[in-house]
Amino acid sequence: VPTQRLCGSHLVDALYFVCGERGFFYSPKQIRDVGPLSAFRDLEPPLDTEMEDRFPYRQQLAGSKMKRGIVEQCCHNTCSLVNLEGYCN
């Protein structure tokens, strides 16, 4: 199955082509663990109180998992028409 990178309007056009009248939606299919990146967190300077107030959930999100969506799957990497079909209604 051939794969290619699809970004921006090319990705949208491909979704219209694959999904047709069914339409499409964004729904993350996979989750990626960002635990190995936690060492970089220790290199950041401490936040002042004002920044902590503006981003109260920052620490909770820092060690969480990132959802992998269609842009990461098809633009940052390559995907096939079969992958795209997973985003159809």
From Swiss-Prot:
GO terms for cellular component: extracellular space. CDD domains: IlGF_insulin_like. It holds the Pfam family Insulin. GO terms for biological process: glucose metabolic process. Residues 33-66 form a propeptide. Belongs to the insulin family. This is Insulin.
